[in-house]
Amino acid sequence: GIDYRNSVFQNIDGSTRIAGLWDQTIQTGNAPKAFDYGSEYREEMLNEALRSEDPLSIVPTTDTNGHGTYLASIAAGNADVNTQFLGAAPEAILGIVKLKEAKNYLRDFYLIREDAVCYQENDIMAGLKYLNDLAENEGLPLVLCIALGTNFGGHNGTTLLSRILDQYALQLNRSVVIGCGNEAAMRHHFSYTISEKMSQPVTAEIRVGSGINGFVAELWTKLPMVVTIVLISPSGERTRQVAFRQGYRYNFVFTF
């Protein structure tokens, strides 16, 4: 989300620099065209709210965790003499999407912690379309700034979201900016180059923190390379050798 009341997102006369704001979490307003959920607040309504003594009574959207306001101010915040602050593009017009958090069944499936912020890929793709449509209606170029991260996927550009971003980046007057993350030393990934001459299996240790009820891990390989795995519990119990086959599911129960 974004704190639209912050002066770094306003013009000199106090009017907003936000052309459109889609809050996917609020269902009491009018949804944007082509969508059936959330509430859209355009420039006129935001200005009405800013002129009011109680802006949130007119436009009730807020920044839940401060992340969106922080990023938007770095990218396009006005100059603030008192704090000696200036965003990268202080005269840019802004389009904002506040994503709704992922549904509980998805969080349960992927064993997402209750305190973790998590979004659905389809809502992200819907947000991209909203911003692209907004830019087209306003006749403006568009820089899509996406400061979200994930440790899932093959990281090879083949996911649906990756392909959609590629298509936006190929369009005239469209650019895509992705946050590179700040978890370089967290060791979330393991990679290995497998050759046909290998005679010994490759061992990868997964460190699970205390108090964790479970985790999800993904194994990616390139076709036609076929791999098999053996899972070894901390107590030394081993599963049989498992080959990956589409549509198959395996359940293993360890004693400890």
Positions of predicted regions on the chain:
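Subtilisin-like serine protease catalytic core
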Residues: 1-120, 139, 173, 212-215, ...
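Glycine-rich, phosphate-binding/catalytic loops in enzymes
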Residues: 10-17, 161-162, 194-196
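Generic structural signal for well-ordered beta-strand positions
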Residues: 19, 239-240
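Exoplasmic/lumenal beta-rich domain surfaces
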Residues: 29-44, 240-256
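Substrate-binding/access-modulating region of protease and related hydrolase catalytic domains
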Residues: 103-194, 211-239, 248-249, 254-256
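Non-catalytic, beta-strand-enriched accessory regions in extracellular/secretory proteins
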Residues: 195-209
